[in-house]
Amino acid sequence: MSVSIKPLEDRIVIQQVEAEQTTASGLVIPDTAKEKPQEGEVVAVGPGRIDDNGNRVPLDVAVGDKVIYSKYGGTEVKYDGQDLLVLSARDVLAVIER
């Protein structure tokens, strides 16, 4: 997926992984009962924040990384017909290595 959006400072843009629609036994989960997703793919990264000495601090994630992030972190946005999440790099809890 190509996203032409550039986040500022230490922010990243994530394409969220959709929550399961059914249980293992085949029951359909209504939207009101679904857990908020906490996993997604990084589609854009900012240049990093500036520290107290004026040096740019690079981010620990890159475009294409699969990440787990804080449940209530970030801001949901709709851009170019896609639902995306913009969040601070400090809201990323882990990078998934598969």
Curated annotation (Swiss-Prot):
Record gene name: groES
Subunit structure comment from the entry: Heptamer of 7 subunits arranged in a ring. Interacts with the chaperonin GroEL.
GO biological process, one term: chaperone cofactor-dependent protein refolding
Similarity field: Belongs to the GroES chaperonin family.
InterPro entries given in the database record: Chaperonin_GroES, Chaperonin_GroES_sf, Chaprnonin_Cpn10_CS, GroES-like_sf
Protein's UniProt name: Co-chaperonin GroES
CDD domains in the record: cpn10
Keywords tagged on the record: Chaperone, Cytoplasm
A GO term for molecular function: unfolded protein binding
Species assigned in the record: Clavibacter michiganensis subsp. michiganensis (strain NCPPB 382)
Keyword Chaperone found: yes
Compartments, record wording: Cytoplasm
GO cellular component annotations of the record: cytoplasm
Its job: Together with the chaperonin GroEL, plays an essential role in assisting protein folding. The GroEL-GroES system forms a nano-cage that allows encapsulation of the non-native substrate proteins and provides a physical environment optimized to promote and accelerate protein folding. GroES binds to the apical surface of the GroEL ring, thereby capping the opening of the GroEL channel.
PANTHER family, A to Z: 10 KDA HEAT SHOCK PROTEIN, CO-CHAPERONIN GROES
